[in-house]
C-alpha cells in the first residue's frame, strides 16, 4: 500500500464530507447517532468476535493484563458505548448558535456564530471505545473525523467503522464523515499529522511517548495535554476534615488517570494535624510516600513509614501509580510558586476556609482547571456538565480543560446590516 496516496485520499474524502456534515440538521445528526447505537446492539456478536481476534493477538505478543483489559470489548463496554451515543444525541447542538449580537454606531449588528472546526484527526492507542466516543462528539459538533487507533485494535475499529458508516448512510449523511485508518503502518500517523490541506486539528489520546512524538513532528494544530502533574495544597486555614476527604479521593480514587493528584503540598502550620492521619491512610492503601525532610519529620513522629526521600525529579513526575510526593511549604506564596514551577498546567486544588486565599489561588495558579475544597478528580467533561469529552487540554490557545462539543467548534464573526457602507 502506498501510504502517502492512501492518506491523501482519506483526507480528501474527509474534507469533502466536512462540508456536508457542517450543514446537516440536528435531527439528521441525532438520527445517525441512534442508528449507530442500534447497529451496535444488533451486531454485538460480530463486534465481540472481531475484538476477540485482537485480544488473542495481544495476548500472544505478551502484552500486559492492563493493556488487554483496555482492549477488550465486554458486554458492559458495548452497553456503555450505546449509552454514550444516545447521551450525545440528547446534548444541545452548538452549531449555528449566535452570541454577543450588538448594534454599532454605523447601524450594523456584529455578533458571533459557532461553527465546526472542519476535519479532526483523532490518534489513540488500545481503547476501541474511543472510536465511538470520538466519532459521536465529532459528528454532533458538525465535524468530519479521521480516526487512527492503535494497531492492536485494528479489527475492532474496522468493525466499528462499518457500523458507523451504516448509521450515517441510514440518516442520509455521507459515510466519509467518519473514517477509520485501516492500516497499522506508523507512516499513516506521520502523514495524518502533516496534512494541513485536509486536516484542521489533531486530538491525540495516548501515552507520553505518543504525545511527545506528535509535538515534535506535527504541522497540524493539536488539542492535547502531555502530563497530568496535579497538586492539592492544604492551607493552614483549611478544615482538616475536608482536607482528609479531598486528599484521599484525589490520590486513591483511581491511580492511572491524568487528573489524579501526584504532589501534596501542606502548609507548615497545619502539617501535623493533616499529615499524621493522611500518612496512615495512604500507607494502609499501599501508597508509597516520597517526602521532603520536613514531611519526613512529621510523618515519622506519627509513626508512619516506610518513607522515601523525594528528589527534585519527583516534583516533576506523573506517576500514574500508587506513589505520592509530599512537601511542606511555608504558605500560599510558596505553594503557588511550586505549582507554577513544577506543575503541568492541568488541574490543581486548594483546601482552605479563607475566601481571599481561595480567590488568589484561583487567579494565580496557571492551570486549565483550578479548584477550591474539591478533589482534582472532578476535572472531567461529564462532571463539568459537558455531557462527554474528547480529551483534556492544558494548552492556552483554543480549548482549555475538558474538551466537549464546544471545544470542537470555533466562533466566526457575523455582521447583519441594512445596506450600510463604511464612512
Curated annotation (Swiss-Prot):
Q: Please state which protein family the record places this protein in.
A: Belongs to the gamma-glutamyl phosphate reductase family.
User: What's the protein called, per UniProt?
Assistant: Gamma-glutamyl phosphate reductase
Catalytic reaction annotation? L-glutamate 5-semialdehyde + phosphate + NADP(+) = L-glutamyl 5-phosphate + NADPH + H(+)
Which organism does this sequence originate in?
Answer: Burkholderia thailandensis (strain ATCC 700388 / DSM 13276 / CCUG 48851 / CIP 106301 / E264)
What gene makes this protein? proA
Gene Ontology MF, one: glutamate-5-semialdehyde dehydrogenase activity
Q: What is its main location?
A: cytoplasm
Enzymatic class: oxidoreductase
Localization, per the record, is:
Cytoplasm
What is its pathway? Answer: Amino-acid biosynthesis; L-proline biosynthesis; L-glutamate 5-semialdehyde from L-glutamate: step 2/2
Q: What does this protein do?
A: Catalyzes the NADPH-dependent reduction of L-glutamate 5-phosphate into L-glutamate 5-semialdehyde and phosphate. The product spontaneously undergoes cyclization to form 1-pyrroline-5-carboxylate.
One GO biological process term: L-proline biosynthetic process
- Reported EC number(s) for this entry are 1.2.1.41
| Disulfide bridges in this chain | none
Q: Mind listing the UniProt keywords for this protein, alphabetically?
A: Amino-acid biosynthesis, Cytoplasm, NADP, Oxidoreductase, Proline biosynthesis
Q: Which is a Gene Ontology cellular component entry for this protein?
A: cytoplasm
- Gene3D superfamilies reported for this sequence: Aldehyde Dehydrogenase, Chain A, domain 1, Aldehyde Dehydrogenase, Chain A, domain 2
Pfam families reported in the protein's UniProt record: Aldedh
Q: Highest lineage ranks of the organism? A: Bacteria, Pseudomonadati, Pseudomonadota, Betaproteobacteria, Burkholderiales
Which NCBIfam families does the protein's record reference? PRK00197.1, proA
Amino acid at each position: 500500500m502506498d501510504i502517502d496516496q492512501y492518506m491523501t485520499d482519506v483526507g480528501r474524502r474527509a474534507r469533502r464530507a466536512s462540508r456536508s456534515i457542517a450543514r446537516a440538521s440536528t435531527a439528521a445528526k441525532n438520527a445517525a447517532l441512534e442508528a449507530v447505537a442500534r447497529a451496535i446492539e444488533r451486531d454485538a456478536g460480530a463486534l465481540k468476535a472481531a475484538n476477540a481476534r485482537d485480544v488473542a493477538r495481544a495476548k500472544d505478543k505478551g502484552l500486559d493484563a492492563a493493556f488487554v483489559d483496555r482492549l477488550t470489548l465486554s458486554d458492559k463496554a458495548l452497553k456503555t458505548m450505546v449509552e454514550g451515543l444516545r447521551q450525545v444525541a440528547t446534548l444541545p447542538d452548538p452549531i449555528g448558535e449566535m452570541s454577543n449580537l450588538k448594534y454599532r454606531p454605523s447601524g450594523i449588528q456584529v455578533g458571533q456564530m459557532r461553527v465546526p472546526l472542519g476535519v479532526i484527526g483523532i490518534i489513540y492507542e488500545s481503547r476501541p471505545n474511543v472510536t465511538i466516543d470520538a466519532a459521536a462528539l465529532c459528528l454532533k459538533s458538525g465535524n468530519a473525523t479521521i480516526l487512527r487507533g492503535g494497531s492492536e485494535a485494528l479489527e475492532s475499529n474496522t468493525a466499528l467503522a462499518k457500523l458507523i458508516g451504516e448509521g450515517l448512510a441510514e440518516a442520509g449523511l455521507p459515510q466519509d464523515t467518519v473514517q477509520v485508518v485501516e492500516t497499522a503502518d506508523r507512516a499513516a500517523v506521520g502523514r495524518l499529522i502533516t496534512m494541513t490541506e485536509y486536516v484542521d486539528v489533531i486530538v491525540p489520546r495516548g501515552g507520553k511517548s505518543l504525545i511527545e512524538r506528535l509535538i515534535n513532528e506535527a504541522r497540524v494544530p493539536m488539542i492535547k495535554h502531555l502530563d497530568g502533574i496535579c497538586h492539592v495544597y492544604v492551607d493552614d486555614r483549611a478544615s482538616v476534615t475536608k482536607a482528609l476527604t479531598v486528599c484521599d479521593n484525589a490520590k486513591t480514587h483511581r491511580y492511572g488517570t491524568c487528573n489524579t493528584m501526584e504532589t501534596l503540598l501542606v502548609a507548615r502550620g497545619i502539617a501535623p494535624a493533616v499529615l499524621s492521619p493522611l500518612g496512615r491512610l495512604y500507607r494502609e492503601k499501599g501508597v508509597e510516600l516520597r517526602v521532603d525532610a520536613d514531611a519526613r519529620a512529621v510523618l515519622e513522629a506519627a509513626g508512619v513509614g516506610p518513607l522515601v526521600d523525594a528528589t527534585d525529579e519527583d516534583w516533576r513526575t506523573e506517576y500514574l501509580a500508587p506513589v505520592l510526593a509530599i512537601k511542606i511549604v511555608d504558605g500560599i506564596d510558596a505553594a503557588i510558586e511550586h505549582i507554577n514551577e513544577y506543575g503541568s498546567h492541568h488541574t490543581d486544588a486548594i483546601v482552605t476556609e479563607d475566601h481571599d486565599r481561595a480567590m488568589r489561588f484561583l487567579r494565580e495558579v496557571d492551570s486549565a482547571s483550578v479548584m477550591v475544597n474539591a478533589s482534582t478528580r472532578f476535572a472531567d467533561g461529564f462532571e463539568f456538565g459537558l455531557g462527554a469529552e474528547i480529551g483534556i487540554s492544558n494548552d492556552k490557545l483554543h480549548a482549555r480543560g475538558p474538551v466537549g462539543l464546544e471545544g470542537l467548534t470555533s466562533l466566526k464573526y457575523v455582521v447583519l446590516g441594512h445596506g450600510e457602507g463604511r464612512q
